[in-house]
From Swiss-Prot:
One of its GO terms (molecular function) is ATP binding. The gene is MOCS3. This is Adenylyltransferase and sulfurtransferase MOCS3. The active site is at C237, C410. The lineage of its organism: Eukaryota, Metazoa, Chordata, Craniata, Vertebrata. Interacts with NFS1. Its main location: cytoplasm. Zn(2+) binds at C220, C223, C295, C298. Plays a central role in 2-thiolation of mcm(5)S(2)U at tRNA wobble positions of cytosolic tRNA(Lys), tRNA(Glu) and tRNA(Gln). Also essential during biosynthesis of the molybdenum cofactor. Acts by mediating the C-terminal thiocarboxylation of sulfur carriers URM1 and MOCS2A. Its N-terminus first activates URM1 and MOCS2A as acyl-adenylates (-COAMP), then the persulfide sulfur on the catalytic cysteine is transferred to URM1 and MOCS2A to form thiocarboxylation (-COSH) of their C-terminus. Binds 1 zinc ion per subunit. Its cofactor is Zn(2+).
Length: 455
């Protein structure tokens, strides 16, 4: 009897806790909604100079206050400094975390994106419970928990040519934690026009870079990169991958440069580029070209006098999301639903998976033949032999004289289109139908098999 009463009591307590949790979630949603509305009206006045630190602040920052290079005056400068963080992802999270911990007076947080499960391995301010919420509000809440004295101003929006210059002018130092060329050019041009130093970092795979632009007569981003790279040569973290600890290292180094700049110590990497190779454990530093007198942004006769359409300038989108290529006509593609119907009908065909081996190791469809895109691009003899044998085997299962269509799949439907173009150019396959599967395996996971891993 006692055991039964305990079970009933526990069940009642669980029900009560679930009701409390539901209420808390509703309050959180309301608070986030209110925050999104109030974020449009942000403080524009500069922070007042600080004459002294409180007793609590002295205790809190005591370990850095005793540094002769920083001291009381440097800490007072940090308390009166406003830093704009563009991007609350793998770089922006550790950067903002250390800026808040060090006592920077105001942090502006710019990001249009929401928290996703794939962010959590490297974006350390966000947690599982906030999936689907705006990154800037998740980050601001975490930073306030860390240091309630720091003013966090979230901007849940993309940085655009219409808003960037006004926003940059409200801050003393800007940190670029973005992951795309249009935003880098936009932020750099805005910093030049506003007269603000720019601390810029990037990370991909096991490598990272860090520099400071437009400081003390040093070069701006356009001085170093007058023309944007071809869009097809740019690899994002979503495409190429990145190790979370790499973004952590670069974000911390970025925070160090921001703190030195804001405290009046001067940055270490103005006119220099720090290169980090995590696999080798190496740090290298190279000197950048000097400020160009003919630079379109910061030169003697600049032509960039206001902000422009940077997506058109770069030929790519101002986002780190995977771009959807359109290399094929609709007739050369098949939807994931139509492919599933074809598969269920047991119609003879060959499914060719062109992802790299490292992605195939994560997940695959068991009936797919794997030949990486790179092997097709270089016409690898062994891969061609395997493909030829698979086509011949497919013909044996088809009606006499019938051809076996090839359907090409990858993660998202981009590399598969490139592969179709390659296969269409081969004379020995000109009699075969070759099509790309729209949306790739992520479409399969979303629309066909909810248990299929997404990565």
């Amino acid at each position: 009897m006692a055991a039964r009463e305990e079970v009933l009591a526990l069940q009642a307590e669980v029900a009560q806790r679930e009701e409390e949790l539901s209420s808390l979630k509703q309050r959180l949603a309301a608070a986030l909604s209110t925050g999104q509305e109030s974020a449009r009206s942000v403080p524009v006045s500069p922070l007042p100079p600080r004459a002294a630190l409180s007793r609590e602040e002295i205790r809190r920052y005591s370990r850095q206050l005793v540094l002769p290079e920083l001291g009381m005056q440097g800490q007072l400068r940090l308390a009166a400094a406003a830093v704009l963080v563009v991007g609350c992802g793998g770089l922006g999270c550790p950067l903002a975390q250390y800026l808040a911990a060090a006592g920077v007076g105001r942090l502006g947080l710019v990001d249009y994106d929401v928290v996703e499960a794939s962010n959590l391995a490297r974006q350390v301010l966000h947690g599982e419970a906030l999936a689907g919420q705006a990154k800037v509000f998740s980050a601001a809440a975490a930073l306030r928990r860390l240091n309630s004295a720091v003013e966090c101003v979230p901007y849940a929006q993309a940085l655009t040519p219409a808003t960037a210059l006004d926003l940059v002018r409200r801050y003393d130092v800007v940190a670029d934690c973005s992951d795309n060329a249009p935003t880098r050019y936009l932020v750099s041009d805005a910093c030049v026009l506003a007269g603000r130093p720019l601390v810029s970092a990037s990370a991909l795979r096991f490598e990272g870079q860090l520099t400071v632009y437009h400081y003390g007569g040093g070069p701006c981003y356009r001085c170093v990169f007058p023309r944007p790279p071809p869009a097809e040569t740019v690899t994002s973290c979503a495409d190429g991958g990145v190790l979370g600890a790499v973004t952590g290292v670069l974000g911390c180094l970025q925070a160090l440069e921001v703190l030195k700049t804001a405290a009046g110590l001067g940055p270490s990497y103005s006119g220099r580029l720090l290169l980090f190779d995590a696999l080798r454990g190496d740090f290298r530093c190279i000197r950048l070209r000097r400020r160009r007198p003919d630079c379109a942004a910061c030169g003697e006769r600049p032509t960039v006098t206001d902000l422009q359409d940077y997506e058109s300038f770069c030929g790519s989108s101002a986002t780190d999301k995977c771009r959807s290529l359109r290399l094929l006509s609709p007739e050369e593609r098949i939807s994931i639903m139509d492919y599933k119907r074809l598969l269920d009908s047991r119609s003879p065909h060959l499914l060719l998976d062109v992802r790299p081996q490292v992605e195939v190791d994560i997940c695959r469809l068991p009936h797919a033949l794997h030949i990486p895109l790179k092997s097709l691009e270089r016409r690898d003899a062994e891969s061609l032999k395997v493909l030829g044998e698979a086509i011949r085997e497919g013909k044996q299962g088809a009606q006499e004289g019938a051809s076996v269509p090839i359907y090409v799949i990858c993660k998202l439907g981009n590399d598969s289109q490139k592969a179709v173009k390659i296969l269409q150019s081969w004379a020995d396959l000109d009699s075969l139908t070759v099509k790309d599967v729209v949306g790739g395996l992520m479409a399969w996971a979303a629309k066909i098999d909810g248990t299929f891993p997404q990565y």
